């Protein structure tokens, strides 16, 4: 009989592991798909995550209400898994079927009634996410109802199933972040998970009707002998206070995850793998903590004492680690380069290992305590063993609902008002508050003071010492390894904002440097200025007359100033996702002068892709200079679907200029980026500034009259701006064109078949983080044999003198392709 029961228990345990795995993969996929549907700004992300967590909370609560009355909880579990699969299969069909409806809502409400717009996004999230997440949240109480057959093993079973499901989620995080989506893409990953859920559901349903379960169902009746003395020891208080404590623990936990994510993203550079690593470490701690505590709870008469100690030590460890967060980028940088040298230059593996190590140092101890808290809370709460499903459901529901509130507080209150390190102290105080709620109850336990004496004072001392340390630390610190190592920059602006952390500093050479979440994104050094100024003027000079121009991204405002100073521009629309970036320029006029107050400028705070997709406006020129594709989320600004959106927003003679890096990217990934761009636009050319590719795409061929082009160039504001980056004549400007359409086609056809970067495969986002050490020389050397262009490809009229000057300028640029890469960059 033991073997039969063990076999049934093992099978359901494996199924529950798979439930956790699929749930996390779904969460990652759904958040990606919803970001494509209604934008990836912080409000969209928060709405999506909040709805997901709220569904889990509601599902657990409902399951708790009805679970104890179910005769076959495993049957219901199996049915729920199949419903989850069906919901996941329908998810993309539902959201992308609402495209036109959402476009109407956007156009009517985004600008004039933003609250209604956000409410509609919330309704979409509820409509698409709530049902499957309710089903997910309902599963744990059902398994506790089935398998917690003796009161003494309640804590053990809760801890076991909570840990096995969390371990599944951990596996799903690593699988989705490193393997599955990268290999199979979003669509096939969804199909694989749907099939997995269906198989899990069918197996659970089959076993719910067989002899194994019947024997298990009789087992509780034979074994459940109550020890009245034990129950009196365990429950000498009102258990509803456990729910309040659990709520605040969940609130603190998710706020902690939000703050840790910001800290580690700034330390690691926010690649898609960085987020997966952080989440994996978080989940591993919860898994390990719940697994380790489960055995100890079996014979413990006072689980509330364990819960009380856990909350105290959570407060202490979070506070203790807060001052150490400043060292995270330095530890990560040194560790990465040390491991790289030990691994014969394998930066990719070294970086991943270093991120895991640093994340574990900050996260693992507190999350282990968090993982142990849930089983302890469940056992502390349940008065009547006959209502074990209800107790489990209620505790899980309160904890998860607290997590919903915590995610909002962490992102919208703590970070923008207090910054990262002070936020950690406040979160530690929340854990202390959770412990104080419990202290009122445990005082009824005989000799409780002598039991917790050590645990009462030491955590408080640690908390106070850490708080003092944080209070005397500088509030403006640069979370960038190279900055910390090589210089002590003057901080012009620092903001831990709602959407991102913005740092603008002045270097030792008086260059202004802008960082977003720890990544250096722009500076006023000569090389960077050259590409930013060209991004502004080049498409306008090629177009001739641009009544409506759009610029994606503000950065340091160099391109923006060039566009505003260009007399060819009549109306300019800036689309910037980060309100903190706008604030930085408004508070520091030295960065971009008075550009943001220019009468020609209209500012839109939105995800650029979402705005272009939803707006009806068309443009003569669109300039796109996104971050490097290795930064998470930015890869969507390099996909075929995005280029098609931009193409649809061009007027008949419209031009798009897209920046594509030639540094920290492999030749293969560069080829993917170029091939993707050329798949969409019928006409294109490649312009080059050291390490930076400027790709010009248009609906119609560009046919310039050189005299008209030169006349536009010689307008004083344009000529002055271009002289500042060393371009003295219109011929020299044309010399920056490296390849025309014919030469680009020859280059792309010279090697193996090149894949297209799409929303589904996200090739660049998943591959470029591993290519940090790739050099520009490797790409330039492969491009070199195909460099060249015919003047007739963009010029319809020119003199022999002009032809010779253009060719001389081109030859000069080509001859410098390799030598300039050896010149020092500030």
Spell out what each predicted region is.
Residues 706-818:
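SAM/dcSAM-binding transferase cores
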């Amino acid at each position: 009989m033991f073997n039969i029961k063990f076999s049934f228990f093992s099978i359901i345990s494996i199924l529950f592991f798979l439930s956790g795995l699929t749930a996390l993969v779904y969460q990652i996929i759904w958040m990606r798909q919803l970001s494509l549907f209604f934008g990836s700004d912080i409000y969209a992300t928060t709405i999506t995550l909040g709805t997901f967590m709220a569904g889990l909370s509601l599902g657990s609560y409902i399951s708790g209400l009805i679970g104890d009355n179910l005769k076959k909880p495993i049957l219901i579990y199996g049915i729920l898994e199949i419903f989850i699969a069906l919901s996941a299969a329908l998810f993309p069909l539902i959201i992308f079927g609402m495209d036109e409806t959402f476009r109407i809502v956007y156009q009517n409400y985004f600008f004039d009634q933003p609250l209604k717009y956000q409410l509609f996004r919330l309704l979409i999230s509820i409509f698409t996410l709530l049902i499957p997440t309710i089903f997910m949240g309902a599963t744990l109480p059902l398994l506790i109802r089935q398998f917690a057959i003796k009161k003494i093993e309640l804590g053990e079973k809760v801890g076991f199933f909570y840990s096995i499901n969390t371990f599944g989620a951990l596996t799903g995080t690593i699988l989705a972040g490193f393997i599955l989506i990268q290999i199979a893409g979003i669509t096939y990953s969804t199909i694989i998970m749907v099939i997995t859920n269906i198989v899990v559901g069918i197996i659970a349903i089959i076993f719910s009707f067989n002899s194994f379960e019947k024997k298990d169902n009789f087992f509780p009746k034979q074994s459940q002998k109550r020890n009245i003395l034990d129950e009196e020891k365990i429950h000498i208080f009102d258990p509803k206070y456990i729910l309040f404590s659990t709520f605040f623990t969940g609130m603190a936990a998710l706020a902690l995850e939000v703050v840790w994510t910001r800290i580690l993203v700034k330390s690691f550079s926010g690649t898609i793998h960085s987020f997966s690593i952080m989440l994996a470490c978080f989940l591993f701690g919860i898994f390990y903590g719940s697994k380790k505590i489960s055995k100890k709870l079996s014979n413990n008469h006072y689980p509330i004492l364990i819960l009380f100690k856990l909350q105290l030590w959570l407060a202490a460890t979070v506070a203790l680690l807060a001052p150490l967060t400043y060292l995270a980028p330095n530890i990560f940088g040194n560790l990465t380069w040390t491991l790289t040298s030990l691994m014969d230059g394998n930066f990719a593996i070294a970086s991943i290992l270093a991120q895991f190590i640093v994340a574990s140092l900050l996260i693992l101890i507190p999350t282990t305590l968090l993982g142990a808290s849930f089983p302890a809370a469940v056992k502390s709460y349940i008065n009547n063993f006959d209502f074990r499903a209800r107790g489990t459901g209620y505790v899980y529901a309160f904890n998860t609902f607290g997590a919903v509130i915590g995610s909002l507080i962490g992102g919208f209150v703590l970070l923008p008002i207090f910054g990262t390190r002070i936020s950690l102290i406040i979160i530690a105080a929340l854990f202390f508050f959770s412990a104080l709620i419990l202290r009122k109850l445990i005082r009824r336990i005989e000799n409780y003071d002598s039991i917790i004496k050590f645990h009462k004072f030491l955590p408080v001392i640690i908390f106070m010492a850490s708080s003092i340390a944080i209070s005397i630390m500088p509030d403006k610190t640069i979370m960038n390894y190279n900055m910390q190592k090589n210089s002590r920059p003057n901080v012009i602006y620092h903001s831990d904002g709602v959407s991102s952390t913005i740092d603008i500093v002045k270097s030792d050479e008086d260059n202004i440097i802008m960082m977003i979440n720890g990544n250096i994104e722009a500076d006023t050094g000569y090389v960077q200025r050259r590409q930013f100024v060209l991004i502004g003027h080049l498409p306008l000079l090629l177009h001739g007359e641009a009544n409506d121009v759009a610029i994606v991204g503000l950065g340091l405002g160099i391109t923006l100033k060039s566009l505003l100073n260009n007399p060819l521009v009549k109306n300019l629309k800036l689309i910037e996702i980060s309100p903190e970036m706008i604030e930085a320029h408004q508070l520091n006029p030295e960065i971009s002068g008075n550009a943001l107050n220019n009468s020609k400028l209209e500012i839109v705070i939105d995800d650029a892709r979402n705005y272009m997709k939803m707006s009806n406006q068309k443009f003569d020129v669109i300039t796109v200079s996104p971050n490097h594709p290795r930064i998470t989320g930015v890869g969507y600004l390099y996909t075929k679907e995005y280029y098609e959106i931009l193409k649809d927003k061009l007027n008949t003679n419209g031009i798009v200029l897209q920046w594509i890096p030639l540094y920290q990217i492999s030749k293969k990934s560069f080829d993917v980026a170029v091939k993707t761009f050329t798949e969409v636009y019928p006409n294109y050319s490649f312009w080059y500034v050291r390490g930076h590719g400027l790709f010009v795409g248009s609906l119609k061929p560009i046919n310039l009259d050189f005299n008209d082009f030169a006349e536009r160039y010689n307008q004083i504001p344009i000529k002055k701006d271009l002289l500042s980056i060393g371009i003295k004549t219109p011929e020299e400007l044309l010399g920056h064109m490296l390849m025309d359409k014919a030469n680009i086609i020859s280059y792309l056809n010279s090697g193996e078949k090149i894949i297209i970067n799409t929303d589904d495969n996200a090739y660049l986002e998943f591959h470029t983080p591993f290519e940090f050490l790739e050099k520009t020389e490797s790409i330039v050397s492969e491009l070199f044999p195909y460099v060249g262009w015919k003047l007739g490809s963009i010029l319809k009229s020119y003199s022999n003198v002009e032809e010779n000057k253009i060719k001389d300028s081109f030859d000069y640029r080509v001859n410098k392709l390799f030598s300039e890469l050896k010149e020092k960059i500030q």
